């Protein structure tokens, strides 16, 4: 499993990176591995509000449908529409295939650094 040190992680297995004041959100390597082959992604629209700890979309894999949980509260300013045509990118490049970008961030869940997230994942098995 990969745990890039420059990212922060939620306990629901989303990663977070801040670029030029915008929060970028994706799913972790641990999440994509647990999901199996991703076949569909349901995304919010630009301008939608997201709330830390609440679902903002879902990912359908060959195993199950799983909620995407927002690690931050704010407004969606960009959606990775490439995932609609190529959802499997979440498997092949989980840290390159961002899902949404959020601006006007007001709040966030408790985010873990890479070492703490790796320890959390090893406890989850």
Predicted segments — roles?
Residues 12-14, 79-87, 93:
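Basic/aromatic-rich interaction segments and small domains that mediate binding to polyanionic partners
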Residues 18-21, 65, 78-85, 107-109:
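Short, conserved beta-turn/loop elements at beta-strand boundaries and strand-helix junctions
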Residues 1-55, 92-125:
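Acidic, low-complexity mobile loops and tails
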Residues 61-64, 72:
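Periplasm/extracytoplasmic soluble domains of Gram-negative envelope assemblies
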Residues 49, 67, 73-75:
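Beta-solenoid/beta-rich acyl/carboxylate-transfer cores
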């Amino acid at each position: 499993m990969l745990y890039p040190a420059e990212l922060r992680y939620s306990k629901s297995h989303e990663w977070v990176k801040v670029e030029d004041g915008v929060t970028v959100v994706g799913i972790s390597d641990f999440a994509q591995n647990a999901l199996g082959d991703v076949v569909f992604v349901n995304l919010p629209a630009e301008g939608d509000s997201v709330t830390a700890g609440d679902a903002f979309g879902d990912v359908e894999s060959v195993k199950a449908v799983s909620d995407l949980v927002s690690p931050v509260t704010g407004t969606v300013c960009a959606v990775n529409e490439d995932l609609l045509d190529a959802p499997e990118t979440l498997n092949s490049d989980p840290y390159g295939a961002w899902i949404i970008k959020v601006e006007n961030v007001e709040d966030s869940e408790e985010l873990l650094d890479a070492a703490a997230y790796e320890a959390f994942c090893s406890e989850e098995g």
